[in-house]
Structure formats: structure tokens, C-alpha cells
Amino acid sequence: MHDINRLENHIADNHVWQMTFRILTMAAFTVYGELPEADAWTDYCYNLWLARFPGLNKDGAWHNGDSYFHVNIRTLVEVPYFYTRLTGFNYFSDPWYQGNALYVIYQQPPFSKSGGNGSSHQKILTPSGTRVGYADALARMTGNTFAADYVRHISARQPDILEQGSTSKAGGLAWFRLQCDKPLPDGPGLKDLPMGHVFPQSGLASFSTNLDDTRKSAMLSFRSSPYGSTSHAIANQNAFNTFWNGQSLFYSSGHHTSFTDIHGVYCHRATRAHNTILVNG
């Protein structure tokens, strides 16, 4: 197999983790018992999941940022759900998923622009159907009531939000929802969360004065990350963004046009494109 001993040691081989690995997993188990090679394929896929996923760390944040997080959603849900049904063990019990629920909420509160990290984050203007659908899946599979309240808050004003993007290639969870009959849990909600949360291993922090009502909330996001500008992360080290009413006030500049063009490098990825606190002031 091409990926053996390479993928395990790659910090973030984006497309493989986003889609190829999930597709390989499902294909390998489909032909298990019919093709001799499938024994090795299934063993590799299962143990690679245990070793490297669901996240690169334990705090639950996504170092590649707010936009490219979304293209991993199907993998983050469908693979552990498959193993859960196969074995009877809930693979969503990994503590990473509880931290990731907080990442979903704090990095982009209901009806707010995203915290502002990673390639193409400027396009993430409000929680998408795939993001809300992911929070819905997390709430059902982990019992996280904060994620459940996040879904209820947004669905109350956007009743069809879970239908938006529900069949998209990377983030659509329609197939999961057809299979999962677990209810949304009840309990503490957004108003019961602390004002802020720090994700120390990923180097992210987000603070909101009113997660329960974005219209009356000021928000600040901050990044100083050991992952640097690797992969789809950008060079916004020691950088912050500020928001009011879900809208950005002081925010990053530029657009993700490509990895190497002048605008993409200097006006989007580079440190000067962000509200960066430099070491010399």
C-alpha cells in the first residue's frame, strides 16, 4: 500500500485524511473475506485510525483552521460510527470529541463569522449546514448538551439548516442521520459555558461575552500555535481578531487564491496579513 510508513508520519496529508482514508476504509471492509489482500487493508485502516485519529492532539481544535476543518467532517463521523456499529464500543468516547464540540462552538458561535484561522477562513460567514450537522452528530454520539444547544439555537431561526449541504462530498451527513436514531440530549446549554476557552496544544483561544445571544456579544479570537503555517494553517502567530454582533471588526486580510501566488503568500498567509503582536512591538 502506497501510504504505509508515510501517512503515519505526515503532519497533515490533507486529501488523504479528508476523503481517501475514509473511502479506503469502507472499501476494504466491503471486500473483507472476499479478497485475501483485504485482511491487510482492514488491519491497516483500523490501527491507523487508533494511532492518528480523530485529531492530531488531545484538545479538540483543528490546526488547519475554520474552513478546511469542514472537509474532514464525514471522516470524523462516518469512520468512528462504522466502528461503533461493528464492535459495540462507542469510538466517540475519545475525549477529543468533547474538546472538538467546544472548538465548533467557541470558534464560530451561532450566527457569527468564524474566528479567523486557516486558508479561506474569510468565506466562513455564519455556521454552515455541514457545521451544524456535525454538531448535531457530536451531540447525539457523545451526549454533549452544549453541542445540542448550539444546534437548537441555530435551527430555531433556520429550520432547514440541517438540509443545507447534507449531501456534500466532504461534509454531508445525510447517510449518518438515516442510520442514527439517538436523540439530541438535554441539559446545560450555551448560557452555562464559560466566557472563553483555551486549546493549549493547538495554540488557539476564543472568548465571547454572550454565546447565548450573538447579537449582544463581543468576541475575541487569538492564535499562537506550534503548528505554525504548515498545511492550510497560516502565519498568524500571536495574532488576534475581534468581533461584535457576529461581524468582524479587526480581522485578517487577503484571500486564499493559491499557495504560491504573490497575493496568497504576502496578503493572506504571511504574518503581515494579520493583527499580529510582534516581538519587537
Where are these regions (language model features)?
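Aromatic-lined, polymer-binding surfaces characteristic
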Residues: 1-114, 120
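Extended polysaccharide-engagement surfaces of secreted carbohydrate-active enzymes
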Residues: 63, 68-281
